[in-house]
Amino acid sequence: MKKSISLLLLSLLMITPSCQKPKEAANEYNIVPKPNQIIPREGRFELSNKVRLVVPPDAPEVKDIADSLAGRLKLTAGITLKEADSADGKQAICFVMEKGMPKEGYKLSVTSNLITVTASQPNGFFYGVQTLFQLLPTAIYGKQLDKKVDWSVPAVEIEDAP
């Protein structure tokens, strides 16, 4: 009888964890605060001196934000982004205006060939670039050149808004 009760209790203990709801996926990208949506993709965007920087014309505040990204990459990675009017199928970081998005909202899309930061307002571009910084190696926050780092970004789709 004791064996039967022990066996029954052991069976119940083994079944109980399988009945629990699955836990929310961890924020594998260590982005703080956690964005509303993170969709992992395959591949990485490799940063180099061949990467183009595409910013909408007549958007000086967005250009300032793009320049802050370019300046940080120059300082810490020794990478100089080439300003261009379009990506033209080349590796590029593109800033795209999209009307109708929330003021501080943004979309960040990273593929092996293209990084796109989409927003409707400068605030959204700012937060998109802050998220991009968090996807880069921590050396991006440094004050000196670090050539030993793998300067690449994991492919991902991120969307966030307050």
Predicted regions: what they are:
Residues 20-162:
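Contiguous, structured surface segment used for ligand recognition
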